[in-house]
Amino acid sequence: MAAGSRTSLLLAFALLCLPWLQEGSAFPTIPLSRLFDNAMLRAHRLHQLAFDTYQEFEEAYIPKEQKYSFLQNPQTSLCFSESIPTPSNREETQQKSNLELLRISLLLIQSWLEPVQFLRSVFANSLVYGTSYSDVYDLLKDLEEGIQTLMGRLEDGSSRTGQIFKQTYSKFDTNSHNNDALLKNYGLLYCFRKDMDKIETFLRIVQCRSVEGSCGF
């Protein structure tokens, strides 16, 4: 193969393998609208996966009486992400700046990079997706990188990275098949769904503020 053709193929392969193109002299600046579109696609995918998996798990394993007692008990329904200061209603959310909402979203994403491993068997056995833990982890990492890129663009025009948030969820015994293990998995799925919903909502608000014509969908 000619040297020129080989170089072209390598360049094309590199571009396809990078979901978030690094901004520098080698590449033109990626439009902000495209960066938001990429982030929103991943956020929506994660939220939909979390919602469907939670619903499927609930219908298959959690009796109604257990569901109600779980949701009404602050100790079992409290998510670790509650320790991350987040707006609790629409008014508070609108008062946050774009960078604040992106930072909150980044912390929420990073808080799941380790705990999501405890749900590997749940994702693998899901009839809705049958996805693997690594697929979910890759989506989280891609979205983490995308949010960091957006923060850099909105702040000073450059990409940025941040400290990974250290998870402190209690260890979940996914190897056990007793009711306690089921409720622990149910609790994790409940929190995962809740946090992915927040992330998609916050990103949608920032996109609406930042990209003309992106509101209302």
UniProtKB/Swiss-Prot annotation:
Signal peptide: 1-26
PANTHER family named among the record's database cross-references: SOMATOTROPIN, SOMATOTROPIN,PROLACTIN
Residue numbers bearing the Phosphoserine modification: 132
InterPro entries, alphabetized: 4_helix_cytokine-like_core (IPR009079), Somatotropin (IPR034975), Somatotropin/Prolactin (IPR001400), Somatotropin_CS (IPR018116)
Pfam families named among the record's database cross-references: Hormone_1
CDD domains in the cross-refs: somatotropin_like
GO molecular function: growth factor activity; growth hormone receptor binding; hormone activity; metal ion binding
Family (UniProt): Belongs to the somatotropin/prolactin family.
Disulfide bridges in this chain: 79-191, 208-215
GO CC annotation terms, alphabetical: extracellular space
Protein role: Plays an important role in growth control. Its major role in stimulating body growth is to stimulate the liver and other tissues to secrete IGF1. It stimulates both the differentiation and proliferation of myoblasts. It also stimulates amino acid uptake and protein synthesis in muscle and other tissues.
Any single biological process term in GO: growth hormone receptor signaling pathway
Protein name: Somatotropin
Keywords, sorted A to Z: Disulfide bond, Hormone, Metal-binding, Phosphoprotein, Secreted, Signal, Zinc
Organism for this UniProt entry: Macaca mulatta
Subcellular localization: Secreted
Binding site for Zn(2+): 44, 200
